[in-house]
Amino acid sequence: RADQRSLVLRCKTGISRIELDQLLYCEVLGRTLLFHLSDGGVLESTGSMDELARQLAPYEIFLRPHRSFLVNMEYVQNISSRSVTLTNLVQIPIPHGKSSDIRRQYLEYAFRRKQVML
């Protein structure tokens, strides 16, 4: 689809294109970026989380609860004071004192998406 947003990655297996709505979260281990997909697959690329976060910022669907993680807010199931739980039950840690800022960012996203808040 023409309106589909995607990311092109240089991986060990070649060049891969992933749709942003299929990206659950990304984590960095050293200089390796791991892209966790909704189908359970994981793609590996090299780079920095800071650069990736800058590239994805205009889409306004990603949350950075921790310096090593970038989360697609479409897949957030719960936010507690210590972690963000995704729909696949993976828990992403939130550093001490950052949970209120993470909640605020998520609520802003939910209001932009016109999701019902109870």
Please state what every model-predicted region is:
Residues 1-87, 93:
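Conserved binding/recognition cores within well-folded domains
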Residues 1-5, 107-108, 112-118:
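Inter-domain helical "communication" segments and dimerization helices
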